[in-house]
Amino acid sequence: MADSRDPASDQMKHWKEQRAAQKADVLTTGAGNPVGDKLNVITAGPRGPLLVQDVVFTDEMAHFDRERIPERVVHAKGAGAFGYFEVTHDITKYSKAKVFEHIGKRTPIAVRFSTVAGESGSADTVRDPRGFAVKFYTEDGNWDLVGNNTPIFFIRDPLLFPSFIHSQKRNPQTHLKHPDMVWDFWSLRPESLHQVSFLFSDRGIPDGHRHMNGYGSHTFKLVNANGEAVYCKFHYKTDQGIKNLSVEDAARLSQEDPDYGLRDLFNAIATGNYPSWTFYIQVMTFSQAETFPFNPFDVTKIWPHKDYPLIPVGKLVLNRNPVNYFAEVEQIAFDPSNMPPGIEASPDKMLQGRLFSYPDTHRHRLGPNYLQIPVNCPYRARVANYQRDGPMCMQDNQGGAPNYYPNSFGAPEHQPSALEHSTRCSAEVQRFNTANDDNVTQVRAFYVNVLNEEQRKRLCENIAGHLKDAQLFIQKKAVKNFREVHNDYGTRIQALLDKYNAEKPKNAIHTFVQSGSHLAAREKANL
């Protein structure tokens, strides 16, 4: 029944009701000139050609032709909302960041949830990591915590990131998703085992965006007012409780309501059911990092909670839907390099790579002045620098202030109090191979200690159900990796694959290589 529709379905109805007492606006061109007729083009006679003087038509079509901006290369499908972060516990002994200044302080935030590999029109219910990015609008500029719904990631070296994403996207010739590409990469990079295991567990398909946790994933550095620093990780735990979708429900929803997560978030906020997350940190001292049993900056691993317990900090609350999706969600740009004083980067290689990649892709997608777009603008800080001009400069371009530094005319000066914390580094410079930095211990703990028997069963079924479409030699490599985690893990997956392969014989012939070549020798070794 139309009378019982949800707020998202009734958006146009509500918009009209809100303007019931107002007269309709006068229709104009983009330049504000009134339009006399929006239904008929100007022609030479009723059946004649169009005239170039029809500026109503050319204004409309020229803008329409340019409506689309480049799609995000990853995290293209997303939902956004706005709200606040409130401090509930004092952590000023760890960080001088103004966002944590005192208990009760509220900071405006913007949040974007997303899937990773799919295009902007893809379903919300696919098995895929979820982006969970938070923009804090602080007095010292924006802080972007660009996280996911998992505390780990597939790789630990940013040089692999383009290849990893290519393997999850579409085949360059067929333009189809390709299990060979996905599993070939994962099987050749066993550091992905932890994230792959999480992805194919029950938490791989969250029930919308409100019922999942968020994580900064990387290791960061906190610096207090005395210049003392610690390493930290950020966690935000859902107050709605964890809920996941079964494979069957996810498949059904992908057909019936592919925008399920977007709709659920919008309707919850529109009806006053504001979602929230409790914000925590883990803290590790520099001396603890030196004696840690593995690299504390490795994003494929977690910090054990029994050794580094969660410390409560505050609450994230979302209480406003976007006024316009394109303006406030499609154009929002999250950048891990946006860190106010008191929050800094660690030597985490993946984080270091993202410090360059994210602002670089924003400049491509939105232009060099993307920080002037209202949703990205650090509106609670005064921006004063020596950057000028460029496409889509939408503000006063800092007027007549000097555009060079140093100068003698009272223009902006740097602040020594904002200097980064000094860090000692190794003098040895080379390309360090980290491919075999214990890829199985924490995965084994996840499989044996975190999952129960039913969850292990579903995990293996989910993996085998996806891996079965890859070629046999790739299946064998993947199963070998799972067996190195735990024999039971690999054995279960192999047993399920054997059933699939008996029902649907595989063709193990793959890319042709010349007999006797180095590629042929390598492929023989893989079989």
UniProtKB/Swiss-Prot annotation:
Q: Name one GO cellular component term.
A: peroxisomal matrix
Its keywords, alphabetically, are: Acetylation, Heme, Hydrogen peroxide, Iron, Metal-binding, Mitogen, NADP, Oxidoreductase, Peroxidase, Peroxisome, Phosphoprotein
Q: Quick one: which residues bind heme? A: 358
| Main location, first listed in the record | other
EC number(s) reported in the record: 1.11.1.6
Q: Where is it located? A: Peroxisome matrix
Enzyme class, spelled out:
oxidoreductase
* Official protein name in the record: Catalase
Judging by the UniProt lineage, the source's domain of life is Eukaryota
Q: Which family does it belong to?
A: Belongs to the catalase family.
Q: Which residues carry this modification: N6-acetyllysine?
A: 233, 306, 480, 499
What is the protein's known function?
Catalyzes the degradation of hydrogen peroxide (H(2)O(2)) generated by peroxisomal oxidases to water and oxygen, thereby protecting cells from the toxic effects of hydrogen peroxide. Promotes growth of cells including T-cells, B-cells, myeloid leukemia cells, melanoma cells, mastocytoma cells and normal and transformed fibroblast cells.
Q: Which residue numbers does the motif Microbody targeting signal cover?
A: 524-527
Query: Could you say which cofactors this protein requires?
Result: heme; NADP(+)
**Which GO BP terms apply?**
hydrogen peroxide catabolic process; positive regulation of cell division; response to hydrogen peroxide
Assembly and oligomerization: Homotetramer. Interacts (via microbody targeting signal) with PEX5, monomeric form interacts with PEX5, leading to its translocation into peroxisomes.
Q: What is the lineage of its organism?
A: Eukaryota, Metazoa, Chordata, Craniata, Vertebrata
Q: What species is this protein from?
A: Callithrix jacchus
Residues with the N6-succinyllysine modification: 13, 221, 306, 480
Q: Which residues form the active site?
A: 75, 148
Q: Which residues carry this modification: Phosphothreonine?
A: 511
> Where on this chain does NADP(+) bind?
194, 201, 203, 213, 237, 303, 305-306
Q: Which residues carry this modification: N-acetylalanine?
A: 2
Phosphoserine occurs at which residues? Answer: 9, 417, 422, 515, 517
| PROSITE patterns for this protein | CATALASE_1 (PS00437), CATALASE_2 (PS00438), CATALASE_3 (PS51402)
In alphabetical order, the GO MF annotations are: catalase activity; heme binding; metal ion binding
Q: Which gene encodes it?
A: CAT
